[in-house]
Curated annotation (Swiss-Prot):
It comes from Natranaerobius thermophilus (strain ATCC BAA-1301 / DSM 18059 / JW/NM-WN-LF). PANTHER family: 30S RIBOSOMAL PROTEIN S2 PROKARYOTIC AND ORGANELLAR (PTHR12534), SMALL RIBOSOMAL SUBUNIT PROTEIN US2M (PTHR12534:SF0). GO terms for cellular component: cytosolic small ribosomal subunit. Gene3D superfamilies: Glucose-6-phosphate isomerase like protein, domain 1, Helix hairpin bin. InterPro entries: Ribosomal_uS2, Ribosomal_uS2_bac/mit/plastid, Ribosomal_uS2_CS, Ribosomal_uS2_flav_dom_sf. GO terms for molecular function: structural constituent of ribosome. Pfam families: Ribosomal_S2 (PF00318). The lineage of its organism: Bacteria, Bacillati, Bacillota, Clostridia, Natranaerobiales. Disulfide bonds: none annotated. This is Small ribosomal subunit protein uS2. GO terms for biological process: translation. Signal peptide: none annotated. It comes from the Bacteria.
Length: 232
């Protein structure tokens, strides 16, 4: 039994690719046909590939590995945050800061600063500091929260990345590839599938399509974690 039906994929518009003039020939094997100047993704392949990605992520989660959800384009931001939080994984949905993986030590320092500012607010330090200084610290905290809030509690590199649109997130993809971190991704007809370990061919621009696939990846994490709990 597949984790998603053709009907669900059709209803969410996962089959709509990009205009034929904006395509990557490497995606040819995942394209079913062309309609009104738009490529239509072969959903039978999407079902099969999503099943493979689901199993891979489930296995990782069962082994206690962390998955980082990455999607900074508007259509992906909410799904990435909501689904990563639902399965208690890390996410980046505002902007990928260069070095988030390859220079993780620096990111760790910024995360520690983020925790330090939160602690200052909680333990009453802000109440005894000058108002101007508190305003400045609050601004600093808000900025850190915006860009690093989804990495709260992250102590080492993730076991895999789940990426929405590897073309848009090319820096994240390059960093993961450099470090040998596997990439699971929704790959549209204008992307290069060779950069991704687990390709899920489909529409990465429609909110409903992105939400559906992201939900399934979060489900696979939860199923993997549940397997661990049942084994215990």
């Amino acid at each position: 039994m597949s984790v998603v039906t053709m009907k669900q994929l059709l209803e969410a518009g996962v089959h709509f690719g990009h205009q034929t003039r904006r395509w990557n020939p490497k995606m040819k094997r995942y394209i079913f046909t062309e309609r009104n100047g738009i490529y239509i993704v072969d959903l039978q392949k999407t079902v099969k590939k999503l099943d493979e990605a689901y199993e891979f992520v489930k296995e990782l989660a069962a082994n206690g590995e962390k998955i980082m959800f990455v999607g900074t384009k508007k259509q992906a931001q909410d799904a990435v945050k909501n689904e990563a939080e639902r399965c208690e994984m890390f996410y980046v949905n505002q902007r990928w800061l260069g070095g988030m993986l390859t220079n993780f030590q620096t990111i760790s320092k910024r995360l520690n600063r983020f925790y330090e500012l939160e602690q200052m607010e909680e333990d009453g330090t802000f109440e005894v500091l000058p108002k101007k200084e508190v305003q400045s610290l609050r601004r600093e905290h808000a900025k850190l929260d915006k860009f690093l809030g989804g990495l709260r509690g992250m102590e080492d590199l993730p076991g895999a990345l789940f990426v929405i649109d590897p073309k848009k997130e090319k820096i994240a993809v390059a960093e993961a590839r450099k470090l040998g971190i596997p990439i699971v991704s929704i790959v549209d007809t204008n992307c290069d599938p060779d950069e991704v370990d687990y390709v899920i061919p489909g529409n990465d621009d429609a909110i409903r399509a992105v939400k559906l696939i992201t939900e399934k990846i979060a489900d696979s994490v939860l199923e993997g974690k549940q397997g661990v709990q049942l084994a215990e």
